[in-house]
Amino acid sequence: MRILGIDPGLQTTGFGVIDVDGHRLAYVASGTIRTTGIALGDLPGRLKLLFDGISEVASRYQPDTSAVEIVFVNVNPQSTLLLGQARGAALTALVNAGLPVAEYTALQMKKAMTGHGRAAKSQIQEMVRRLLQLPGLPGTDAADALGLAITHAHAGAAMSKMAEVTQLQRRQHAVYKGGRVY
């Protein structure tokens, strides 16, 4: 399975693509989409650049699913609104590409990657480097995106296991209650 992770931002959006085969993780690609070349006041232009960039990444790497960071509420409401709009452009591009979208908070990703939710960016970079056996540290935005993809790979495996257990429990319950297996 191929997973595309997205760390949305209005100036810099990180992306990371990994392949998952059972418990094996393999690095495919990562990078950033920068909107700094567009004037700060041209919000629609920046959002279009993000949409087009994520659409291009999805088209090039053909992921099966995606994972996106959930926006946190910032002290500055204007910053939160702008980040939310960037996230909206990312979500729209992913859905437009026909991808399922899973959402994780930064805290969930950090906890999944390092064991605690208050990890520094450098710790995320190092764990991504180790888990994907990269020769060097990825940039912070790309590392966060790869971390989201890895988090989704682990969460997806856990969710599949839970679904199997739930199905087994339903079957046992059906046998016990009704005498039949459905």
Curated annotation (Swiss-Prot):
PROSITE patterns: RUVC (PS01321)
Cofactor dependence: Mg(2+)
InterPro entries: RNaseH-like_sf, RNaseH_sf, X-over_junc_endoDNase_Mg_BS, X-over_junc_endoDNase_RuvC
Cofactor note: Binds 2 Mg(2+) ion per subunit.
Group of enzyme by EC: hydrolase
Subunit structure: Homodimer which binds Holliday junction (HJ) DNA. The HJ becomes 2-fold symmetrical on binding to RuvC with unstacked arms; it has a different conformation from HJ DNA in complex with RuvA. In the full resolvosome a probable DNA-RuvA(4)-RuvB(12)-RuvC(2) complex forms which resolves the HJ.
Name used for this protein in its record: Crossover junction endodeoxyribonuclease RuvC
Organism: Delftia acidovorans (strain DSM 14801 / SPH-1)
